[in-house]
């Protein structure tokens, strides 16, 4: 019997790839997904996640973390008056003196993984997939995609004693 897996599903290419890999490895019947709304301007993300889950026939749970990010000045969030930049990460980092890009939502992945761990444990899942990758960590654009952030995996293991995280950039 295959272990159960939870996939953090945003509807983007990275999380959709994680979903397909989880289904391939664990079987469709052993995969569930969590989609998180956090007040992002692009509500099409949630619509895409629903469409992807429907396509694969996967059970989806949704969670609204909008209040948690109400104080962030991140340009991705709907309450921000700032435009989402079109420049490359390298250009943005140069303009900001090496500070994270304006689309960085503080500790978003940390909160997402913590929420996913809680839901996953309740659903008896022992693996969590999410689509962070090295490009997002380049130059400290998104600190919660960095190698240092991998420590979050160890915290999840300690807290749950049975849940491990599988990251797209680390899949073998």
What function would you assign to each model-found segment?
Residues 2-172:
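ATP-dependent adenylation/nucleotidyltransferase module used to activate substrates
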């Amino acid at each position: 019997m295959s272990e159960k897996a939870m996939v953090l599903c945003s509807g983007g290419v990275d999380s959709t790839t994680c979903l397909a890999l989880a289904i391939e490895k664990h079987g469709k019947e052993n995969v569930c997904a969590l989609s998180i709304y956090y007040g992002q301007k692009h509500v099409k993300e949630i619509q895409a996640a629903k469409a992807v889950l429907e396509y694969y026939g996967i059970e989806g749970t949704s969670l609204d973390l909008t209040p948690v990010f109400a104080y962030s000045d991140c340009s991705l969030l709907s309450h921000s008056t700032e435009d989402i930049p079109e420049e490359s990460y390298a250009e943005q980092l140069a303009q900001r003196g090496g500070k994270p890009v304006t689309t960085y939502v503080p500790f978003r992945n940390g909160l997402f993984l913590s929420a996913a761990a809680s839901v996953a444990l309740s659903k008896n899942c022992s693996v969590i997939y999410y689509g962070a990758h090295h490009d997002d960590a380049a130059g400290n654009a998104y600190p919660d995609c960095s190698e240092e952030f991998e420590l979050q995996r160890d915290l999840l293991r300690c807290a749950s004693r049975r849940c491990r995280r599988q990251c797209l950039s680390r899949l073998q």
